Amino acid sequence: MKDKVVLAYSGGLDTTAIIPWLKETYDYDVICCCINCGQGEELDGLDERAKLSGASKLYIEDICDEFSEDYIVPCVQAGAVYEHKYLLGTAMARPGIAKKLVEIARKEGAVAICHGATGKGNDQIRFELGIKALAPDIKVIAPWRQDNWKMDSREAEIEYCKAHGIDLPFGTDSSYSRDRNLWHISHEGLELEDPSQEPNYDHLLVLSVTPEHAPDEGEYVTMTFEKGVPTSVNGKKMKVADIIRELNRLGGKHGIGIIDIVENRVVGMKSRGVYETPGGTILMEAHDQLEELCLDRATMEVKKEMGNKLAQVVYEGKWFTPLREAIQAFVESTQEYVTGEVKFKLYKGNIIKAGTTSPYSLYSESLASFTTGDLYDHHDADGFITLFGLPLKVRAMKLLELENKKNN
């Protein structure tokens, strides 16, 4: 009986060409595994394609609920955003995929796991760190990093497939490199490789329209949260995955969440991408608005630092680490009272606040009002400012003393 390898399979040209290459190079029995994180119609016809390409079996595993609840929610609660813009759509999905690949490999008794990530990108790191953390005994094969992988173009891959009896309708024309899941869709390549060029949004966008093509009338949306977890949209209770789908629909219609960024990859190079994250952008903003009411300043300050750190940890593929667990534990402790309702208006790329309520709100109208109230005596500010400004006053007095000595 041949040894088995589990291939992370998308159905695209790269992973299709890898199937005969694995059989030819290693004489493995190839088990394809496609992890559904919300790719949609990209999954159509995969079973036939995998078998025509020489795979002995195909698993299609739906992890949309796990992805949304176990990976997206913790990042939303933390406010994890990489380099101030990127909402981690691809990075958040990779640990769940790695976990499922390991599960299938264990089930099949496979000796290796193979992925089709290139040697220039972040995904090779994310997949392999996840596999190392969960299954250090399983071999990882990365064809793009091997000398005996000779295919350096789409044309070469198509010819290789045809030579091995695989004649599938893959086009040779260049197109955007895309990654789609429940949370977002990313675009790289073509004109985006030149930072001086404006993206061709008419051909690029899939989930969204540009703000200038959005409706001229705004749309109000209401969301509820319980302990930092979204529970409903416009009064309708839903699973987190369905909330994201609905927010994608609403946000995409109004041009929300289109970003064009140059980011620093883990491997050291800069890359440019356009990301569509309409639902994610809305969800992050709504959660932030609720936290403004419910969290004290000191907690918010530390939580912001932890959110930035978590973004880096997730981006670098270090999900299965004690550090991620510790950060997540802290963040979860801050969410105990992040419960309430957030209302906002979507209008031409903008999310406009329209009211926030919470039974745990720390906002006190009697304290914040400019009128006289019983809870706050304006005279109390005298002593506070004296003590709060004492370090500044002491330093200024010392500088004045030194200046006087110098002049005398």
From Swiss-Prot:
Positions with a binding annotation for L-aspartate: 118, 122-123
Catalytic activities: L-citrulline + L-aspartate + ATP = 2-(N(omega)-L-arginino)succinate + AMP + diphosphate + H(+)
GO CC entries: cytoplasm
Pathway(s) where this gene product acts: Amino-acid biosynthesis; L-arginine biosynthesis; L-arginine from L-ornithine and carbamoyl phosphate: step 2/3
InterPro entries tied to this protein: Arginosuc_syn_C, Arginosuc_syn_N, Arginosuc_synth, Arginosuc_synth_CS, Arginosuc_synth_type_1_subfam, AS_cat/multimer_dom_body, Rossmann-like_a/b/a_fold
Major enzyme class: ligase
Subcellular location per the Swiss-Prot or TrEMBL entry: Cytoplasm
Residues given in the record as ATP binding sites: 8-16, 116
Keyword Hydrolase: no
Keywords associated with the record: Amino-acid biosynthesis, Arginine biosynthesis, ATP-binding, Cytoplasm, Ligase, Nucleotide-binding
GO BP term, pick one: L-arginine biosynthetic process
Enzyme Commission number(s): 6.3.4.5
GO MF annotation, one: ATP binding
Subunit structure: Homotetramer.
Descriptive protein name: Argininosuccinate synthase
Originating organism: Agathobacter rectalis (strain ATCC 33656 / DSM 3377 / JCM 17463 / KCTC 5835 / VPI 0990) (Eubacterium rectale)
